[in-house]
Amino acid sequence: MSGRGKSGKARTKAKTRSSRAGLQFPVGRVHRFLRKGNYAKRVGGGAPVYMAAVLEYLTAEILELAGNAARDNKKSRIIPRHLQLAVRNDEELNKLLGGVTIAQGGVLPNIQAVLLPKKTAKSS
């Protein structure tokens, strides 16, 4: 009778909320952070699932673009520079992360148009 409680029925295998929602990010941990963070007195059951899904989507989006930047630079490992290039070259991500500084990210290459040499028309 091992694995059975008082009711006599076998206990089903525990299923995480992340796997129920089809997510990789930990729903339970997000729920704990929402409760401990003093954001509200009470946290609904769907809130951590939704937030974990949003975090997972944003992470996947940034990593996709950073992987493309790494491949363009002929590198197999994503470094902070690739994250910076990915975020700053994407209009929506740049707006979302406008006030964020990425350590060791560098700057985007940019030369103002007025500093470029003048185009002279050669007449021959």
Curated annotation (Swiss-Prot):
Q: What is this protein called?
A: Histone H2A, embryonic
Q: Which residues form a coiled coil?
A: none
Cite the residue spans of the region called Disordered.
Answer: 1-21
Organism of origin? Psammechinus miliaris
What InterPro entries does this protein map onto? Histone-fold, Histone_H2A, Histone_H2A/H2B/H3, Histone_H2A_C, Histone_H2A_CS
The record's comment on protein family reads: Belongs to the histone H2A family.
Domain of life from the UniProt record: Eukaryota
Q: What is the effect of changing residue 121 to G?
A: In P.miliaris clone H22
Partners and quaternary state?
A: The nucleosome is a histone octamer containing two molecules each of H2A, H2B, H3 and H4 assembled in one H3-H4 heterotetramer and two H2A-H2B heterodimers. The octamer wraps approximately 147 bp of DNA.
